[in-house]
């Protein structure tokens, strides 16, 4: 249907786009911080204070780095190597989805709080922090879409039998 070179170009474009979106998501989340004075006390909000946001940064950074390192692998590798690479991509995709879900849950908690647990919403006090987290989540959702498109394309183009 498509030439080998055309398939390779599509795979590279998808991989670079996913790596770029993951890098943007990681950087945006890593830059998420805000300071305010509440009742005479200085309150800081930083991504490092929430393990799920740290996980989001680490997962996106790992996906970005691994996606770019894979580009160094020659396209003429064995079918076994291609399958191992596909399995690694699937695992990274699952980690990426888990990190996005965890960060999304924390963003929801920050925005609306939880009245049953007595947790107040913090986005009213630290809007800059919440805006940056929201921006990172938008980039993270783009990463997931691009990464799964790349996975589906890799599965489609991978030969089924040796």
From Swiss-Prot:
InterPro entries: CASP/CASPL (IPR006459), CASP_dom (IPR006702), CASPL (IPR044173). The chain crosses the membrane at residues 8-28, 53-73, 84-104, 136-156. One of its GO terms (cellular component) is plasma membrane. Keywords: Cell membrane, Membrane, Transmembrane, Transmembrane helix. NCBIfam families: A_tha_TIGR01569. Belongs to the Casparian strip membrane proteins (CASP) family. This is CASP-like protein 1C1-2. It comes from Oryza sativa subsp. indica.
């Amino acid at each position: 249907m498509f030439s080998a070179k055309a398939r390779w170009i599509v795979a590279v474009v998808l991989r670079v786009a996913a790596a770029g979106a993951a890098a943007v998501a990681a950087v945006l989340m890593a830059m998420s911080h805000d300071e305010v004075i509440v009742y005479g006390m200085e309150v800081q909000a930083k991504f490092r204070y929430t393990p799920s946001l740290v996980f989001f940064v680490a997962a996106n950074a790992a996906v970005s780095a691994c996606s770019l390192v894979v580009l160094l692998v020659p396209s003429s590798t064995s079918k076994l190597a291609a399958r191992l690479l596909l399995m690694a991509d699937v695992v990274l995709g699952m980690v990426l989805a888990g990190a996005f879900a965890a960060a999304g849950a924390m963003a929801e908690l920050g925005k609306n709080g939880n009245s049953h647990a007595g947790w107040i919403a913090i986005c009213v006090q630290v809007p800059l922090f919440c805006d940056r987290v929201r921006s990172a989540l938008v980039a993270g959702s783009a990463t997931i879409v691009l990464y799964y498109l790349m996975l589906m394309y890799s599965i489609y183009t991978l030969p089924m039998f040796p």
